[in-house]
Amino acid sequence: YILNMVYTETLREEEGGTYGASANTQCIFEPISMKTMEIAFQTNVEQADKLRELAKSGFENIAKNGPDAEKFDKAVNNLKKEIPESRHNLSYWSNALSTSDKLGIDFNAEYENAVNSLTLSDVQEAAKSLISSGNFIEIVMRPE
């Protein structure tokens, strides 16, 4: 959520370069533990390189300085709001049962606890961890 807000502000509103950008993270535990983040947006050829650099610098800024407190609060409040809503979805319970079985934890309770205890520092450390991994793939598709 935080990066989505950053990118709406910079890539869309300030630069007028895209209708929207999305940042999605995923944690995988098997067969190996892995964290991934995908940042995606569409733009015109003329602005592609500039927006790509702005997207990277927005993420790097969070790793270096931590997230903006207002954006952090909005993101956490949104996550808290989604918890009871998610519990009405089969996919939530499928994931909760699978995670509980594989990791031996009560996903339903632990997820809510994790959201409630999330700090600005946690977000900054997660960003640092992703950047310091050194695994970075950049894909730019341009028309011929």
What label would you give each PLM region?
Residues Y1-T8:
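His/Glu-based metal-binding/catalytic segments typifying zinc-dependent metallopeptidases
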Residues T8, R12-S117, G134-P143:
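M16 family metallopeptidases and their MPP-like homologs
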Residues S121-K128:
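Mature hydrolase/peptidase catalytic cores and their serpin-fold inhibitory cores, especially
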